[in-house]
Amino acid sequence: SVAETMYKLTGMVMMVAPYGVFALIAVTVSKYGLSVLAPFAKVIVAVYVGCALHALVVYSGLVTVVARRSPMWFFSGVKESMLTAFVTRSSSATLPITMRCAKENLGISEKISSFVLPLGATINMDGTALYQGVCALFVAQAYGIPLSLGAQANIVLTATLASIGTAGVPGAGLIMLTLVLTAVGLPIEGVALVAGIDAVLDMARTCINVTGDSCVASVVAATEGETLSR
């Protein structure tokens, strides 16, 4: 299938990515100096805090208002899939565990979970969109490029659209980041700055992506009249 072909191509790219990252970082540092590497910690904190707030505010709100269940019930039910996603950095690899948690812990039917969760693992990438937006701003600041309000809005739109087409495999978000940077006229070499910490960022965004899939499945189940577990 087309999806499997894309996964294999992505895997091939990621195998040689470290060599390309080293070369890009060498060029960037030689041109702009070591000071350009200093804000990495801020990027990591921004992505992790953003993901945490998204889960605690958006997902908790949806579960409470629509599914009529407590956030503690939800996060307790999906903690295994969240941990697996954090470790594997792959929505696709986590999918079997996500489906099992949805059925056994949340009480979502096979009919809904087997449709919503695989679809979500393909197109529902909240964490990836957040990550791409933060990284685009980081690249702009690192290169001293001012962004107008329109450019920032363009980043939000492009990051959202690019995340929908991101494969659920480790490192795929970094490849799609090039589209976001190109769309707003930022230097594509900025990907090298992000690549050095991408594995750390990938853990958080994949965890949020998978959690969002389970949240949507819970909401769909509730709106379809199913009785969720307590």
Question: Model segments located where?
Answer:
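Hydrophobic alpha-helical segments of integral membrane proteins
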Residues: 1-13, 33, 37-44, 74-78, ...
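Signature of multi-pass transmembrane helix bundles
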Residues: 1-73
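Small-residue-enriched core segments of transmembrane alpha-helices in multipass membrane transport
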Residues: 3, 41-58, 77-83, 153-164, ...
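Membrane-interfacial loop-to-helix junctions in multi-pass transporters
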Residues: 11-15, 49-50, 64-74, 106-113, ...
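Transmembrane helical cores of multi-pass ion-transport proteins
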Residues: 13-23, 91, 220-230
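Membrane-embedded alpha-helical segments of transport systems
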Residues: 16-19, 50, 120-131, 197-212
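Helix-loop-helix junctions within the multi-pass membrane cores of secondary transporters/permeases
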Residues: 80-163, 217, 228-230
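Transmembrane alpha-helical segments and their short flanking loops
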Residues: 133-230
